[in-house]
Each structure stands twice: as C-alpha cells, then as structure tokens.
Amino acid sequence: MKTIMAKPGQVERKWYVVDAAGKPLGRLSAGIARILMGKHKPIWTPGVDCGDFVIVINAEKVALSGSKELKKVYYDHSGYLGGQRVTPAWQLRQKKPEQLIYRSVKGMLPKNSLGRRQITHLKVYAGPEHPHQAQQPEKIELP
C-alpha cells in the first residue's frame, strides 16, 4: 500500500464560518489553526498547503479566562532602540478585536513560508457580518 502525498493542484479548498462569541481564545485558535493547516483532511501532507479558508465572526466577544483580560500583554517592536511597545489585551480588544484571534492563530502555525501562506486564509471580523457570502461558507462549531 502506498502513502498518498498531496500535490498543490489536487487540494480542494472549502470555506468555513466560526462564531467566536463566548468561546475560549486558546481552544478556538487551536481548532482554527488545525483547519488552516489541513490536518483535518486525510490527504494532509506536511510540505503542502492543504488547508481550508476560515471566516471568524464576533471576534470582539471571544472569551479570555481568569484575569488574562488585564494581565496578558502583547509585545511589538519598531526596530529602533527603545522601540518596544506593550499593549494589554483589554486595550487590544477595544482598538482591534480581530488582532486577538489573528495573533493567537498565527502563533500556532508553522514559522516558515508555508505558515505565512496559511495565515492569509484566515478572515477575522469583529461583528456578526462578513462579505464572503459568495463563497457559500459552511458553519462549523469549534470548542
């Protein structure tokens, strides 16, 4: 019996919609990363982008457990001396709620060119509306 190795032209991509309202950030992000990588498919191949597209709605209502809302911080750096910026999670939720999910999922993807391509298949929206109705996305439930 031969092992099936998928080629980039053989991969069929689907679109999924995930509602983030009230879901824990880490569990939600792990499920989304799994779909983006394509690990839920039997033809998953390590070096090939086998993943599907994921649309996340209600990103502003994602749950952070415990005191993470106040204590969790996100670091950025401008590249200049003294250019480090620290943003707490509560402030990031007010300004750019999509970034909470985006950063969490990006950290769970491979740190190479394949991961950079896979993160482009993630579409995150703060509210319940999204402009991707033409793709006929399928609604799925993640823990």
Curated annotation (Swiss-Prot):
Q: What biological-process GO terms show up in the record?
A: negative regulation of translation; translation
Q: Which GO terms describe its cellular component?
A: cytosolic large ribosomal subunit
Report whether Ribosomal protein shows up as a keyword of the record: yes
- Which InterPro entries does the entry mention? Ribosomal_uL13 (IPR005822), Ribosomal_uL13_bac-type (IPR005823), Ribosomal_uL13_CS (IPR023563), Ribosomal_uL13_sf (IPR036899)
Per the record's keyword annotation, is Hydrolase included, yes or no?
A: no
Q: What NCBIfam families does this protein map onto?
A: rplM_bact
Query: How does this chain assemble?
Result: Part of the 50S ribosomal subunit.
The protein depicted here goes by the name Large ribosomal subunit protein uL13
Classification from the root reads:
Bacteria, Pseudomonadati, Coprothermobacterota, Coprothermobacteria, Coprothermobacterales
